[in-house]
Amino acid sequence: MPMETGFTSPGPLIVQIGGFAVRWYSLLILAGIIAGTLLSQKLAPERKVAPEVLSDLVVWLVVGAIPMARLYYVLFEWQRFAGEPWWKVFAIWEGGIAIHGAILGGLLAGWLFCRRNGYSLLTMIDLAAPGLILGQAIGRWGNFFNSEAYGAPTNLPWKLFIPEANRPPGMAAFAYYHPTFLYESLWNLGVLALLLFVFFRFKNLRPGSIACLYALAYSVGRFWIEGLRLDSLMVGPLRTAQLVSLAGIVLGAVGLWWLNRRSARQEAP
């Protein structure tokens, strides 16, 4: 009998001692934050910003992003949390945050940081965008260990085994699913390569261009990948992430057009 191929999660826990547990999900979020911060610090001198400024900015971004990421998720999954103990709302270590909520919270915190310290918001989000997408690429692997954020059943060689307890209602007979976490992680690495190429190749771009390119490129991939998932956050019959991704595509494209048009006008004789 041929052996099955594909991914199988070893489980969400790295180690557990009594009631204390170290989870892959939390570790990968932390790793993503650290890697993203180091990358943005490395890029900062290219825009005449001191690397330590990025360290201060990241503290603000994390404080704004993580609570908003959880709040966003809980609001759209309220029927699930309404029947749980109240403390489950805050149990981020068990999984359940939304990147779009994190981006909204991070933007608000970044705006407050720049306003308070006199920095250009557009320059700062240009520096933060490559670090953010790197952090997303790393953090997505937390979904693998939690056996979540997967797609429709499949028999492809890179299929993902999902334990029966984590399968959707009515789909217990299907053991293997699309590893959408992997698709998004790889897409994010591609977006990172694009952002870094543009960042170093076109150094005279208007501030905000890298952030707009991030919004456009990430949203295109997220819209496609979200259509494969079975556990999307929903607004009625609509997938929330696809709606937000459409907005990201429009805002990113319009922002790039507006910045380039504005730049061309200023350079015209």
From Swiss-Prot:
Superkingdom of origin organism: Bacteria
One of the entry's Gene Ontology molecular-function terms is: phosphatidylglycerol-prolipoprotein diacylglyceryl transferase activity
- Chief location of this protein within or outside the cell: membrane
Q: How does it sit in the membrane?
A: Multi-pass membrane protein
Q: Pathway of this protein? A: Protein modification; lipoprotein biosynthesis (diacylglyceryl transfer)
Residues binding a 1,2-diacyl-sn-glycero-3-phospho-(1'-sn-glycerol), per UniProt: 140
Q: Where are the transmembrane segments?
A: 14-34, 49-69, 89-109, 118-138, 180-200, 208-228, 240-260
GO CC, one annotated term: plasma membrane
Q: Which InterPro entries match?
A: Lgt
Keyword terms, alphabetized: Cell inner membrane, Cell membrane, Membrane, Transferase, Transmembrane, Transmembrane helix
Q: What does this protein do?
A: Catalyzes the transfer of the diacylglyceryl group from phosphatidylglycerol to the sulfhydryl group of the N-terminal cysteine of a prolipoprotein, the first step in the formation of mature lipoproteins.
What protein am I looking at? Phosphatidylglycerol--prolipoprotein diacylglyceryl transferase
